[in-house]
């Protein structure tokens, strides 16, 4: 069961890295090792290459996942295909984890990120966001027999979250008393919650 919490997340958005050019790397000339320069492709570069490189999830249905035939599917992928079509190019996908979305966007490893990416102040200081294309709320999923209806019920329970998500940030900041078990991938979160004697 999905329980909406009072803390509603801003919006899942398209991260637009093509325009992101300032603030990457060290500006201090005394640094012995400067951060490598990020390489961002312009729309003209993308059109000339014939492909738009898009960071998506590969394990978070219905947003981004790989189907039984090995093809990327989901809402974010559908949106990516439309963007590529509008540019007259093919979509090329790079599988991301929640914790590496900012890195891939700000270093130019992908042209854009379409991976269920909520706008936060901290993220907006590092990457540029376009307008939202969906809204979500933070929630908790629990077995029917242990229906969670309030945060107080999470005391002495183990809450599973994906690293680099707003769920992780929210609980770390607002509810440090809740024990978190953090995984890199949503697949691992799901596997750990499969029927077992765990909470």
Question: What kind of region is each of these model predictions?
Answer:
Residues 142-159:
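Flexible hinge/capping segments at coil-to-helix
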Residues 35-116:
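Extracytoplasmic small-molecule ligand-binding "clamshell" domains
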Residues 121-132, 136, 176-177:
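Ligand-binding "clamshell"
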Residues 10-19:
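Bacterial N-terminal signal peptides
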Residues 66-68, 80-89, 167-185:
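Ligand-binding cleft/hinge of the Venus flytrap
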